[in-house]
Amino acid sequence: MKSSELNQRRQQATPRGVGVMCNYFVEKAENATLWDIEGNEVIDFAAGIAVLNTGHRHPKVVAAVAEQLQAFTHTAYQIVPYESYVSLAERINDLAPIDGPAKTAFFTTGAEAVENAVKIARAYTGRPGLITFGGGFHGRTFMTMALTGKVAPYKIGFGPFPGSVYHGVYPNATHGVTTADALKSLERIFKADIAPDQVAAIILEPIQGEGGFNVAPADFMQALRDLCDTHGILLIADEVQTGFARTGKLFAMQHYEVKPDLMTMAKSLAGGFPLSGVVGRAEVMDAPAPGGLGGTYAGNPLAVAAAHAVLDVIAEEQLCQRAEQLGSHLQEVLNQARATCPAIVDVRGRGSMVAVEFNDPQTGEPSPEFTRLVQQKAQENGLLLLSCGVYGNVIRFLYPLTIPDAQFSKALDILARVLKS
């Protein structure tokens, strides 16, 4: 079957709202390689949108899921619990940068984790208000759309959204937004929109994902912690995209001398299986009444088995160090490309959470057109890239951290040629 034929069937069978980026269909995948139904080979620098830090079908993940498949596939943890859920919670509690005793609850999607973090924060504080940041992305449910600071394509035509959500400014040195500017935006919210004693939580991504891989400065993160402590506000770190070795640490918050009260996780937690979680201070996590948290598929045993294997692989294969090594090489290649590609305005990131931003050299304005061209040319040469950014003018790199050196070098050669051309 040809991809063109299958695309016609897709258009007839599925709604246009489920946007599809690639015009080919995958048949098989292994580590950092995809093969489409026509036999073409693609180097995967998207990894299912940051889900495959341990690669496609890592043997240890596959083996763990296969073993669980022979035991049981579903009971609903709230009905009949299982040890693997408890032991995974224990592992996350030990690993997460939470101050004091921690507890963890598992869910299915990143948006579901954020929704439950909001429920927990409101239950603990008895307050309604939430502060988040422009450019942030937190999910596609109604509450998480309200929290998200990017309209297209996520929020168009879906309002009105839940209230008591306020957006501050996220620091961005490339665009001249300082930590002081960001903090002033919060002061204005407290003066104009909601009193601080009515705010349950401030939620942010330590590195914005969809927003363009903008890295929160250390002084900003410390100021948020101090602000939260002053007013009895909880600090929630959304680590859905940043977690599990992507940034060179198991969690991005470990780059800071700051500990959140709650932290959300998903994506690479379970190596391609749907699993998310919220970890936080035990007293905060215990605020909802029994039955207040859960879900039919929350903490599915197959996904939990995969997550145990993922944590083992990250430790055994030293993927945090690997992320630093690969990311450093990538940033070097991108910075060298600036000499021949005047559209590059910034190269940024931490570990292997790296991005390059493009502007029109003539006008200085964001150039989503050039960004799409880079993606197109890369795809023609067998390299799959993702874009992001409020203006769609950023390429983000989300390759598996298990990618072989030779394949990584090949991908960077393709990237360098595309940028030069």
Residue ranges of model-derived segments:
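Conserved N-terminal phosphate-binding loop of PLP-dependent enzymes in the Aspartate aminotransferase
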Residues: 1-421
